[in-house]
Amino acid sequence: QIRILASNTPYDAFEFNGNGGVKIAWTPLLRDISGFYHFCVAVDTTQSTNTNRVKFWLNGVQVTTTSTANWMSQDADLQVNNTTEHQIGELRYNASTELDGYMADMVLLDGTATDYSSFAEFKNNVLVPKNPSGLSFGTNGVHLKFASGALGADSSGNSNTYTLNNIDADHSSIDTPSSGAGS
């Protein structure tokens, strides 16, 4: 699971948890709780150097300082993109811990680990989402645009549509992180 820890404000950690006690926590402070943040996590368990197996970018800058680092073993088989339930905006196994925020776009690539520049770019000194349609999504990859009326619809071409639970189309907003950033 990938999650933002908010034990206080500013948010105090961004965490990756995997099976077998894997836990990596980065500690960038997210001071503006109303601002747009772009998170990118790349996982490649085939890497021989443990710190290269999970990488994290916040707003286009790689974060390398960790408060906790229990890395997975090389070639570890993780739950993401396996036959397990995937949840977005909710802490797995704890339905009372839900995201209190907005998501503009979510891309999950299967079999490819890449940095933030595949998903976002700077326009007029503002980080905005890029169209990921040219990326290789792999078999289990997904692109969720969270568009009104189709919040769980997959736009990757894989038809990996997510089932909504306790959410309706009226939970969407027409505002986007790219509003006003130019084209």
Question: Where is each model-derived feature located?
Answer:
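Extracellular glycan-interaction surfaces
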Residues: 3-74, 171-183
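Extended recognition patches within non-cytosolic domains
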Residues: 48-50, 67-68, 102-159, 164-182
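Extracellular glycan-interaction patches encoded by glycine-rich segments
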Residues: 77-103
